[in-house]
């Protein structure tokens, strides 16, 4: 959530931010609502002050046995009580309208973020490795998976439905190896490994920005306040919701690997083949809670951490700085990491690393006690995929395929797999 002070002090910046993000959100009423909210709060404050004064006066006049004056003051007290009830009710209505708008306003992009309308205006920052070339007719990962019998699309559709997949045999072992590699690299870089519930409540989703705006993307559990988590960012960020941390404990760095669930609303027709876009998918996640002065340094470090996994696997990738029109709702600055996928003959997103500044922390009230000011301040939160594991699986299978239809196991995974290749079984 944005800082409310911007409504009064720099409304133009807010309007510009929404324009640059291609947002159609109407905030024209926000200034008047905020002003009315402030006026009502002043009335309530004045009434409470007056009520306290009258209460003291009543005690004095009771002591003087001036019943007439006591009755007059009690009538005045009753009038104030009625005013407070009416004003509080009006404030409740106004505050709800203000909160509805504030919860729908995306984070303000950092000044270093390029202004643009779509992914076409994202900026390439770096490339690593050379796109894989083959001297034979290479196959897409969905064909390799079927040929090597390491997964099953048809039976997953039978068991559940479209956009689901079953890993099996060496395919399941390869997925487990990718989870272990990503977690091992993350923990070696100071991240604390967590194992978390895959079900979260609405308060957690509101804190990280999925609710209320993106409810249609979620799988809700019927007749409850529970949802299947769309990303481990939700659980890891909310771990310290409504808590005050010691400054000396920062930064806090968490990692976890688990299943995630998204309805993929609005994605009809996109990546319909293979395991690139599914309703249920594996992901290893990074979340940082940091001192506000160090969040942009943390973003660079987090991105390098995610990239190091691709380098360990010797997979070509590039880093992209997202423009204002392509950024996530809660982010102030985002790098996408894209891995080379031969079946697409292009790079495909495998990670997003974002600095959310205090946007999520304000929603979730995660604070730290500043040792210099002795005041409680909001932490900055960051999150990043390290990595999207189904896409990483596809990248390994495609980039390491051989002419005979086998797959060479990347050196970094051999110790987890115990084999150096996956071959067709006769």
Curated annotation (Swiss-Prot):
| Annotated binding of ATP, by residue | 262-264, 349-352
| Pathway the protein contributes to | Aminoacyl-tRNA biosynthesis; selenocysteinyl-tRNA(Sec) biosynthesis; L-seryl-tRNA(Sec) from L-serine and tRNA(Sec): step 1/1
Record field: catalytic activity = tRNA(Ser) + L-serine + ATP = L-seryl-tRNA(Ser) + AMP + diphosphate + H(+); tRNA(Sec) + L-serine + ATP = L-seryl-tRNA(Sec) + AMP + diphosphate + H(+)
One GO CC term on file:
cytoplasm
Entry binding sites for L-serine: 231-233, 285, 385
E.C. code: 6.1.1.11
Entry note about domains: Consists of two distinct domains, a catalytic core and a N-terminal extension that is involved in tRNA binding.
Role played: Catalyzes the attachment of serine to tRNA(Ser). Is also able to aminoacylate tRNA(Sec) with serine, to form the misacylated tRNA L-seryl-tRNA(Sec), which will be further converted into selenocysteinyl-tRNA(Sec).
Family of this protein: Belongs to the class-II aminoacyl-tRNA synthetase family. Type-1 seryl-tRNA synthetase subfamily.
- Name used for this protein in its record: Serine--tRNA ligase
What is the organism of origin for this protein?
Malacoplasma penetrans (strain HF-2) (Mycoplasma penetrans)
